[in-house]
């Protein structure tokens, strides 16, 4: 893991790929973390929030800027990011219940009481960063089964090494009753938002962009949303 100082905090990278922008004060990271934080803000989970993959706590600065005070249960096998977070953002540590553990084993031991689960795992491979294989097969049904009634899953996806991006993504969406997709101008990531009932695509897009503009994130104007399921996807 390479750690570089930035104007607002630290940048964590592997093999030249940025893993996380860790701000030490409330505000935007201008990265995918802003969208993940924005979704937590606009979806307004009232109960438990789970985060699989901590990435140095990059979501905390935009969450604080958005006024979100909810605590999250976070799990990761790599302790380096959490230790950096504790050292550089001590006032935010109380907002995170972190555990070093395998995400699948940890989630299997949890009750089905999550209002929202964010899947944000990644692994380095051959000079790049990819999603682990469990993202595409083991985790989607497990996450679905650990959601409370009305709970929503948020998957931060990257193209798999062997291709099959569209097929795998749509297969994941079909495990849920309703799904939306967020894509980016700046990143190859896609964010899948899925559950029994997800806000309509226009409503979700409007709320998400408003939240991002509130904190001054450049991503407010660089995202697109659409409905994944249905005979004719709606783009907004």
Placement of each model-derived feature along the sequence:
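The AdoMet/dcAdoMet-binding core of the Class I SAM-like
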Residues: 2, 7, 25-146, 162-163, ...
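A short, flexible beta-alpha/helix-coil linker loop
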Residues: 17-20, 122-128, 153
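Generic structural signal for hydrophobic
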Residues: 63, 172, 231-233
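A general structural signal for short secondary-structure boundary/capping elements
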Residues: 53-56, 161-165, 201-204, 225-226
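C-terminal substrate-binding/active-site "lid" region of AdoMet-derived donor-dependent transferases
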Residues: 128-131, 137-201
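A generic structural signal for alpha->beta connector loops
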Residues: 69-71, 93-95, 150, 176-178, ...
